[in-house]
């Protein structure tokens, strides 16, 4: 139980403190990569959804 509580606290703290990363800007030399960097956090969610599509394709065996 303590481990789960600790994990939840760590996750909440990382969410609260990582909000400063969203307002960070790339260096000027990498400014052309801004659209790609904006999409990158969504990629793990797409893999998660792909797992459900795959399981639906094989009838949730």
UniProtKB/Swiss-Prot annotation:
PSII is composed of 1 copy each of membrane proteins PsbA, PsbB, PsbC, PsbD, PsbE, PsbF, PsbH, PsbI, PsbJ, PsbK, PsbL, PsbM, PsbT, PsbX, PsbY, PsbZ, Psb30/Ycf12, at least 3 peripheral proteins of the oxygen-evolving complex and a large number of cofactors. It forms dimeric complexes. The keyword DNA-binding does not apply. Residues 1-24 form a propeptide. It holds the Pfam family PsbK. It is found in: Plastid, Chloroplast thylakoid membrane. This is Photosystem II reaction center protein K. One of its GO terms (biological process) is photosynthesis. Signal peptide: none annotated. It is a single-pass membrane protein. The gene is psbK. Its main location: plastid. The chain crosses the membrane at residues 40-60. It comes from Morus indica (Mulberry).
